[in-house]
């Protein structure tokens, strides 16, 4: 009798569907086609300054991310109304300082450092985004805290000069004018700087960038002119920098970016409060971001088993809790 009762209980247990949390109903790709730059599958926490995600369009109205385009120009940290900031992109192609237009080639003459993606690998949930970059030959993963972005790039093969591009003047919905951009090498694993940016108004974005392994060189560029192996770089207009690494197959390069609209001390404070407690544990930051969303969304309970209605409600609610910095 006891054995029969146990078998019945086990049958009932395994016959039940897994219980889903509110955050599991959110599809971050809904509403990302024919939409504004503020609406993309960005890694963010509720009301976070950082909305880290892919850009794949040229500079024009309703630019930013478009779901139907199967490439990525880079991963930008801020997607707000008339405000954007610091695009990062891994690259293993021939060195170019232009990200490339949506219609330009990916190899050879006139190619940019943008990359095609394998669309079936594009995944995401609140606080996380991932895709395989075909031309950059790596898996890109993103997560975020309030003021910080966390990147993970896992390369599929060995490369002697894999690059992480740091682009200050990239395509944006309202365009971007860099009055002054600055990078300073603090160590072979840390860079700091700022971008004095002018869109409709002026703002200065300060950034601190940390890497989990030493880079070989830091290099700056303006237009197509490159200054190699330098410690400091100041320029304007179309400018940026890049670091170079030797990487092995299946090796991950991790990048932590702390931002502030105040000063460098603000960057350091944000790093100390939001990323340092996790060390280089990308998965822990990802899970913390997901849990933050789930805690917020759980404030509204939905009775019944109508999954479609839950998807609509929790997706809409998550959209209300994104920061536009207007």
Could you say what each language-model-derived stretch is?
Residues 12-20:
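Bacterial Sec-dependent signal peptides at the C-terminal "C-region" and cleavage site
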Residues 19-326:
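Accessory carbohydrate-recognition regions in carbohydrate-active enzymes
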């Amino acid at each position: 009798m006891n054995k029969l009762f146990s078998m019945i209980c086990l049958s009932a247990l395994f016959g039940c569907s897994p219980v889903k949390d509110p955050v599991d109903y959110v599809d971050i790709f809904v509403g990302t086609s024919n939409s504004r730059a503020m609406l993309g599958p960005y890694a963010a926490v509720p009301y976070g300054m950082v909305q880290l995600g892919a850009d794949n369009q040229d500079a024009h109205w309703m630019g930013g991310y478009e779901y139907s385009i199967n490439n990525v120009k880079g991963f930008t940290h801020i997607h707000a109304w008339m405000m954007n900031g610091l695009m990062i992109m891994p690259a293993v192609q021939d060195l170019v300082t232009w990200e490339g237009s949506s219609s330009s080639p990916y190899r050879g003459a006139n190619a940019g450092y943008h990359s095609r993606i394998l669309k079936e690998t594009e995944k995401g949930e609140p606080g996380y985004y991932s895709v395989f970059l075909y031309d950059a030959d790596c898996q890109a993963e993103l997560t975020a805290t309030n003021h910080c972005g966390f990147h993970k790039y896992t390369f599929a093969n060995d490369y002697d000069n894999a690059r992480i591009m740091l682009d200050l003047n990239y395509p944006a919905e309202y365009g971007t004018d860099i009055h002054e951009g600055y990078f300073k090498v603090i160590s072979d694993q840390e860079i700091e700087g700022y971008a004095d940016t002018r869109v409709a108004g002026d703002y200065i974005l300060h950034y601190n960038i940390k890497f989990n392994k030493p880079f070989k060189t830091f290099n700056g560029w303006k237009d197509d002119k490159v200054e190699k192996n330098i410690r400091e770089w100041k320029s304007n207009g179309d400018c940026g920098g890049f670091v170079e690494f030797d990487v092995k197959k299946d090796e991950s390069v991790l990048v932590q970016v702390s931002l502030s609209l105040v000063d460098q001390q603000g960057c350091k404070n944000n790093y100390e409060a939001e990323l340092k407690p996790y060390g280089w544990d990308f998965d822990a930051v990802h899970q913390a971001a997901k849990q933050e969303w789930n805690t917020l969304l759980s404030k509204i309970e939905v009775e019944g088993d109508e999954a479609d209605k839950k998807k609509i409600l929790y997706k809409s609610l998550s959209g209300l809790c994104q920061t536009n910095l207007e």
